[in-house]
C-alpha cells in the first residue's frame, strides 16, 4: 500500500508531502498480474496506482524545483532516500509564492483523492 501524508499551512498553501510504500493487489495493476521477475515484484511501471501516484508527486517536485529557480524566497527540501519513498517540504516562502503553493495543494489533493477513491485498498491518503 502507498501511504501519503499531505500537509498544508494555515494559509491553505502546500507545506509538505511524504510518500512511502508500493501499491499491491489485483486492482493495482488494472486486474493484470504484471510480474517482471521471479521474486513476485511488479515490473517498473506495471502498477497503475504506483504509476499514477508517482506522476503526480514527481510533477509536484518538478513544479517546486522550477518555482525555486524563479523565486529567491521559495525554498524546498526534496528527499528520495530509497525506492518507494519521496518527500518534499517547504522551508521558506513569501507572499508572492502563495498562489503557486495554494494551487499545488489543490492539484495534489484532487489527484490523490481521485486515486484513493478508485483504489482504496492501494492508497492511504492523510490530509492534514
Question: What are the functions of these language-model segments?
Answer:
Residues 59:
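A short, conserved beta-to-alpha structural element at the edge of catalytic cores
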Residues 1-48, 62-128:
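N-terminal intrinsically disordered, cationic/polar leader segments
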